[in-house]
A protein has these predicted regions:
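Alpha-helical transmembrane segments and their helix-entry boundary regions
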Residues: 10-14, 87, 146, 160-161, ...
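Active-site His/Glu-centered metal-binding helix of metallohydrolases
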Residues: 23, 137-142, 146-147, 151, ...
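Short juxtamembrane and helix-loop transition motifs at transmembrane-helix boundaries
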Residues: 51, 92, 122-128, 178-188, ...
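Membrane-helix boundary elements
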Residues: 154, 158-188
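Functionally important transmembrane alpha-helices
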Residues: 185-249
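Membrane-interface helix/loop boundary segments of multi-pass membrane proteins
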Residues: 138-165, 212-217
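Specific transmembrane helices
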Residues: 2-136, 164, 195, 233-274
Length: 274
């Protein structure tokens, strides 16, 4: 029997997502070094974050499949897909990893002051709040709404996670050129820059596992992504400690892949595009 072709088109999706995001973020990078107002820069960052979600909506419109659109809306708003047994992992993994990494950093000169919660003015600015709360929502609406499924419909989850992780890391590139942005500060060290890209690839494995173990719930992925962003924002972990966090993330991801190898290495992907 001839295999039914997948309705998902990964290449156009990622091209649109990158084009939208990079246009606004590279414009932001220009204005950040040429006297652009903070309000304008915040708007450009927000518009860039919309890239994945905009790409997903465009692809659903081009596909014109009521089934895919209905499936997307359901996964975007319904809580019934979430497996409650995964909630502790979703909500507490990153606070636990960061605190463990801080403890491990102390013998190597890390500051005990990393064990703190910050809610200072720098955290409460509009650009910061946009990044912390809106970024996970808009990203996951696109990445897990269409992007990851589009790759998974053709390949194993392991290959999907590697390839998507690399694309996701590369997608952030313009942020490194925005003066005053967190990513721009990482350019002072090749290790810290490399750690960001490595952590993003590993993060793809963790979020994708939650995604498919929660019946492709976008809300579950948003909560895990939000937990990571909030934890990294309010716990003042030093850059060396963040490297330790990445190592711990890798160990958790490796344990998940080994323990759930059928999910990661089976070619079939039930429910996608059906």
């Amino acid at each position: 029997m001839k295999e039914t072709p997948s309705p998902y088109k990964p290449a156009p999706f990622f091209l649109i997502a990158f084009a939208v995001t990079w246009f606004f973020w590279f414009v932001d990078a220009y204005f950040s070094g040429n006297g652009g107002s903070q309000a304008l820069q915040g708007l450009l960052v927000f518009l860039g974050i919309c890239g994945p979600a905009a790409a997903a909506l465009i692809m659903f419109w081009l596909t014109r499949s009521p089934e895919l659109w209905s499936d997307y809306r359901d996964r975007l708003v319904s809580l019934r897909h979430i497996d409650l047994r995964t909630l502790p992992f979703i909500l507490f993994l990153f606070p636990a990893l960061i605190c463990t990494a801080i403890a491990l950093s102390l013998p190597f000169g890390g500051s005990p002051g990393q064990f703190a919660i910050l809610f200072g003015p720098a955290i409460m600015t509009l650009p910061a709040l946009t990044g912390i709360f809106l970024a996970p929502a808009l990203e996951e609406a696109g990445w897990r709404g269409y992007g990851v499924d589009s790759i998974r419909s053709r390949f194993s989850l392991f290959f999907t996670s590697v390839s998507f992780g690399l694309l996701w890391a590369f997608w952030h590139t313009p942020l490194f050129f925005i003066t005053g942005f967190y990513h721009n500060s990482l350019l002072s060290s090749w290790l810290f820059t490399a750690n960001f890209f490595a952590s993003t690839v590993v993060m793809a494995f963790l979020v994708n596992w939650i995604f498919y173990r929660n019946n492709r719930s976008i809300i579950a992925c948003f909560l895990l992504h939000l937990s990571a962003d909030v934890s990294m924002s309010i716990i003042p972990a030093e850059q060396f400690t963040r490297c330790v966090v990445t190592v711990l993330m890798f160990l958790v991801a490796a344990a998940i892949v080994i323990g759930d190898r059928d999910l990661f290495f089976k070619r079939t992907a039930p429910g996608i595009g059906s």
